[in-house]
From Swiss-Prot:
Record's keyword terms, sorted: Carbohydrate metabolism, Cytoplasm, Isomerase
Reaction(s) catalysed by this chain's protein: beta-D-ribopyranose = beta-D-ribofuranose
Lineage: Bacteria, Bacillati, Bacillota, Clostridia, Thermoanaerobacterales
Protein name (record): D-ribose pyranase
DNA damage found in the keyword field: no
Broad EC category: isomerase
Subunit structure of this chain's protein: Homodecamer.
Protein's gene: rbsD
Protein's pathway: Carbohydrate metabolism; D-ribose degradation; D-ribose 5-phosphate from beta-D-ribopyranose: step 1/2
Residues reported in the UniProt entry to bind substrate: D28, H97, Y119, A120, N121
Domain of life of the organism encoding this protein: Bacteria
Length: 130
């Protein structure tokens, strides 16, 4: 059995296959998932698993160079915005929700959580650990 925090085999495989600048999306329960992008649906019910729990677990194994969020989060989900700003600092890039949806078409996978708060979506750009 794995010793690290990330136990979901599908997510672990995607993270292991990411190369430098590849994209991984962690999404709330409402973000549209484009055709052709791998869907990893871990939503069980409203709020479970949460966006934060999923993100924090993925970050135990993924080095992030940049993180993209929708500017709408600043007003509509400010607590999450402040949390992400503290977590990522200058790596956090603000774009429109429409641009985030367009960018998600290039993701290696989208992890759909049970998060039920607005604009709880992030695109993680894989970095290098050397």
């Amino acid at each position: 059995m794995k010793k690290t925090y990330l136990l979901n085999s599908e997510i672990s495989e995607v993270v292991a296959r990411l190369g430098h600048t590849d994209l991984l999306v962690i999404a709330d329960s409402g973000l549209p998932i484009p055709d052709g992008v791998k869907r990893i649906d871990i939503a069980l019910t409203k709020g479970i698993p949460s966006f934060k729990d999923t993100l924090n677990t993925v970050l135990t194994e993924l080095g992030v160079e940049k993180a993209y969020i929708a500017k709408e989060m600043i007003d509509k989900n400010n607590d999450l915005y402040l949390y992400l700003l503290e977590l990522f600092g200058e790596k956090l890039i603000i774009i429109s929700h429409e641009d985030l949806k367009a960018m998600s078409k290039n993701a290696r996978a989208i992890i759909r959580t049970g998060e039920y708060k607005p604009y709880a979506n992030i695109i993680l750009e894989s970095g290098v650990e050397f």
